C-alpha cells in the first residue's frame, strides 16, 4: 500500500463511485426513453386510464345527408362525445343550465344543437352574456 499515495486513495474513494453513479444514471435514462418509445407515451397529449379502440377503414364511409322538402341537402356531422357542460365562448363561460349529460346530436355545422331532454336556449344567460343578434343556431 505504500505505492498508493493519499491523492490516489482520495481519487479511488470519491471519483470511482461518482463515475459508477453517472454510468448508472445514463443507463436508467436510456431505459426510460426506450420504455416511452415502446408504449408510445410521448405521442399522446394526455394519458388516461380509459381503454379505447381506434379503427381505420380503407373505404370512405357514407356521409349522412338530410334532404328538406324543397330539395336542399345538408351534410350531417356526427360528434362522438357527450358532455356535461358546454363552453359558450370566452365572454359567456360554461353552460350548466341543464342537469345530466348533454349529448351532441346530428348537426349541420360546427355550432352544436344539443339534445339534453329539453330545448336548448340561451334565455338563462344574463343580458350582457347573450350572443350577438347575428349569431344563429346551426350557422
Swiss-Prot record:
Subcellular location: Host membrane
A GO cellular component annotation in the UniProt record: membrane
Pfam family, one: Corona_NS4
Keyword Transport tagged: no
Main localization category: host cell
InterPro entries, A to Z: Corona_NS4
Membrane topology note: Single-pass membrane protein
Tree of life domain: Viruses
Signal sequence interval, chain numbering: none
Residue intervals passing through the bilayer: 12-32
Keyword annotations of the record: Host membrane, Membrane, Transmembrane, Transmembrane helix
Family statement: Belongs to the coronaviruses ns4/ns4.8 protein family.
Protein name per its UniProtKB record: Non-structural protein 4
Species annotation: Murine coronavirus (strain JHM) (MHV-JHM)
